[in-house]
Amino acid sequence: MKINNFLTIILIFLFYLSSPAKDANTITIIPKPNEMKIGKGNFVLNPSTKIIYSQGLDKHAAFLRDYIKFSHNFNLLITDKITETNKNFIYLNVKDLNSNSEEYELDIQPSKIMISSESPKGVFYGIQTLRQLIHSSKKIQCLKIVDKPRFVYRGMHLDVSRHFMPKEFVKKYIDFLAMYKMNTFHWHLVDDQGWRLEIKKYPKLTEVGAWRVDRGDKTWREREPQKPGEVPTYGGFYTQEEVKDIVKYAADRYITIIPEIEMPGHCLAALTAYPEYSCTGGPFTVPPGTYWPPLEAFCAGNDKTFEFLEDILTETMELFPSKYIHIGGDEVVKTRWKECPKCQERMKKENLKDENELQSYFVKRIEKFLVSKGRKLIGWDEILEGGLAPEATVMSWRGTIGGIEAAKSGHDVIMTPTSYCYFDYYQGNLELEPIAIGGYLPLTKVYQFEPIPEELSNEEAKHILGAQGNVWAEFIPTTTHAEYMVFPRIAAMAEVVWTNKNLKDLKDFMSRLAHHTKLLDDLKINYAKSMYDVKITSILDTIKKQVKVEMSTEALNPDIRYTLDGTEPTKKSPKYKEPFILKKSAKIHAINFYDKNKKSKESSTEIVLHKGIASIVTNINYDKKRYIAKGLYNIVDGVRGSLNQNDGKWQGVQGNDFFATIDLGEVKNIKKVSIGFLQNYHFSIFLPRDLEVLTSLDGKEFKSVGKVQNTIPIDEKKIFVKDLSCDINDKARFIQIKASNIGVNPDTHPDKGFKSWLMFDEIIIE
């Protein structure tokens, strides 16, 4: 018996001896700390654990207590008394670390956890790190973290003009930012579609400008303007007392709120309330959707306009103590200024050569006022037009060019380019996602964002303050939808702005995120599951004229099941293991069965193997900047496009006709030629007027063998793909396609007169 007990002890000892020690890769903190060393042992949280805090950190202790109560239902004692008899405690402490105010140290030992910083802010960030460690387990790995952010500006934006978001959600949104150690909330309070901030000197801004007619039964771009006799009922606004409450709530979490008061454009809600500050005098109504171009702007030739705006900014600054005030400055269509006698007189008086310089005058005048009040101006990168205001900070959204220009001229910059930072873009396959404004920005692409452009020198790079994610709400009508568009992309953005570039690793991030979703689930956050969806791609072998199929997910370790006949996959369907050669045309469907009983949405694509696969394409015209897809072989790779023009399967030409010539390599019997076209009315994408097919034996002399007219009405607003086909029954080596563009958008279109797109995916030769 004693021998058996001895053997048991030896086996247990050997088990622990052979158990692998945890390393940094098993710690699932987001954003990833910049310095971390794993220790030995664990701190075990229990109901008797005390939270001890130094002077001034009582709120921090309360935050931590609440986080722990949420995770483990322990209501821990908090105290500012520390004694030598204390065991199993968490100590929050402000002390001299010879570091910056955002740096913190987190030291986890078997008997205690210590969070230290030079400032309460740093302690708060340490608490956010500990919060994530505690949520996953009561047993917390011993470690030491010394951490600080890479960038001083770490932000998220929220548009509450297009759809009003209640105060409770705004606070919840601030909590989201705090969880990821972000420090700036860019609050887009006003725009054409609604004024959301109470200004006591001008009550009609909220009495009139905060409300519009309800067109919730229509998509954003289909909404008709307010008709005579209709009563605006949709909207809302924040009282000044509510704003003060929100500002304090954010400050308690070390988040600065930067308000945005749009000018000189995007101001139709304000002009509806006070039309005398426009160029035409109105009348106006608050639009329930977006109509392009947005013609109205504040009159730059009227001094009363500036008095009006300065009064508004004065009340705004009384509510928001932020260093910065955002004045917009984007997308100002200057038609009204060109037609306005007062604006033209202003240009003459100030010796301004054009309306761009008039915009510069406008921004500089507002900046001078803000500087006189001890504030700094931020504007979208259009404020560069006509000359930048002396102390302005540029928010670069139209790519990085504006940010580069501003930084090279010595101005501070916040990077937020559409291609990496616009969270209103689709994050997955359009056919699987709720309707969005357009674009395509998956989680992994957000993570790959580098805010400092390579074009900048080390000295110029110092002007890049940081970056932010933008949440424009045209297609985000509810708070749960807002959460869906924000999460989990906010986690990727948080790591972009916090973690040093050399420590970032996409695979490591996705591994940590897989664990992090438990916290999101427990917080009941409606995060997108798009990272689990299967992406089906193809590789064209132009030598063997074969198509190889690949399947992948953004999430790690997928269990992908697929079918080739268009039926829904089950757990018993073939498991995807490696790329495979497609033997015949297929309607491929795939589902990722992940995390035990969960499954992704069903992905699908169609690949058609035809006589033109991998043929040589010559003399083709397509936009080689916006819609490159797979280049010359895109129309002969067998892959059909989805309903999303940005899925990488579509090519297009704007304003001009489409033509292409295909060399089959040898003379073949051709029965039929088809080509797929996309119609998306709201994105100015239309079917062609007609399709003509020509054939040739030698590539020199072509004959027309078929022509078909499009019969679908030009104003059809559904998004769909239409194949136009010609039965030809001919022998040919060369096939030539001609499709005529409608040229410009019809008069019924919101963007009438603009050059229209003709988009095509595959030429199918049978």
Regions found by a protein language model. Give the residues of each.
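Surface-exposed loop/turn motifs at beta-strand-loop junctions within extracellular Ig-like
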Residues: S119, N592-K596, N741-G743
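Active-site neighborhood of glycoside hydrolase catalytic domains
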Residues: A270, P287-G289, P294-P390, W397-E405
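Flexible, acidic glycine-rich loops studded with aromatic residues
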Residues: L377-E382, G387-A392, R398-K548
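Feature activates predominantly on carbohydrate-active enzymes
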Residues: S99-Y324, R365, F369, Q468-W472
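Aromatic, loop-rich ligand-recognition surfaces of beta-strand-rich domains
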Residues: L643-G706, K718-E766
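Bacterial Sec-dependent N-terminal signal peptides
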Residues: M1-T26
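Contiguous, structured surface segment used for ligand recognition
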Residues: K22-Y153, H481, V497-L523
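Short, compositionally stereotyped local motifs that mark structural "simplifiers"
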Residues: I52, N500, K504-T661, L678, ...
